[in-house]
Amino acid sequence: MAHPNPVYVGMDLGTFKTSVASSAGYRDVTPTAVGWPKDHIARALLGRDVVFGPDLTEHRLALDVVRPFEKGVLKYGDPAASGLTREQVETHMLATRLVIDYAVNLVTPDGHAAGRPVYGVIGVPSRASLKNKQFVMDAAAGVFDAVAVVSEPFTIAYGMNRLADTLVIDIGAGTVDICPIYGVYPADAEQVTVGLGGDAVDEEFEKRLRAKFPKVQVSRNMVREIKEKYGFVNAVGEQAVVNLPVDGKPTPHDVTEPLKAACLALVNPVVTAVRGLISRFDPEFQQRLRNNIILGGGGSQLKGLDRVIEQSLAEYGGAKVTRVSDATYAGAVGALKLAMNMPPQGWTALAGRPKATKPVAVAA
């Protein structure tokens, strides 16, 4: 597996967004989604067969958009129990591969063109099954020459050089991953994945918003933007007043109550999982874990979440929670650092695997 001059890539393949960084000195972020023009008119308008990035939102009415990891199903859950047909699973596989390829091209503008192999470390949920990991590796075939699939929270800890006595909570759109770090790569059984995340908060917020303001017209993108700007879980001192259309007219609405209730829906499952995981270790190590909790992922930006977690552990002896300094790139930068330090036996060769072909019909 050794090569004198590969390009290394670290990738946080998120449910909603994918962040990526490379040893070539580039980093970027893109939606984990692919759009196909709905018909020949849309194809002529867009001038291409596949759409990525900001154009997915701008032209969403003209596109069949696929988010392959929506609600974490194919990254964490059982594809057979997902309700997806075989054709839909194949379409999601293709969408995943196209996202990976697009993201890698963003940060390796001269990678393959210069004849250099590309080695990548990809982060997945803590308790992703072998089937889930294989899905990601199969999707990476034809993009990377070699790959390593690792726990997402571990990449955060590795990037911060917090490799001992640390508990990482990575709150993504589809899952919350909790991982203890104590000087070695953690075993799967020692980690926890909670099958909800930012998507569940968006869903709950939209439901409560429509119940309180039945005349309001909102999209899921609008709901997500409000949450990302105003989301909070602390007791007092926050207010969220936003303009929302009613019969086409922007009208101020106080969404504080439904927003807080939706965000709080994330707290109890996370706190319960953290308490349960910490209790598995001996008392001395429990204290060290509680006093060195790292909060990462997009959900870490909810105002007051760090304090709420600390308060929830007060009766267990207290805790110290620190947010990552850059929630967008912490996982990708850590994965890149891990890739650059990976021993040859840590890589799985992918060269020679077939690339995906475009399906005849795209399942919505």
Question: What annotation goes with each model-predicted range?
Answer:
Residues 18, 34, 100, 140, ...:
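Residue-level signature of catalytic and energy-coupling elements of molecular machines
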Residues 87-99, 148, 155-159, 202, ...:
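Helical "lid/coupling" subdomains associated with nucleotide-phosphate turnover
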Residues 7, 118, 147, 164-167, ...:
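The start of beta-strands in P-loop NTPase/AAA+ ATPase cores
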Residues 91-162, 183, 198:
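Active-site neighborhood for divalent-cation/phosphate handling
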Residues 9, 15-121, 270:
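Conserved phosphate-binding loops in N-terminal lobes of ATP-dependent enzymes
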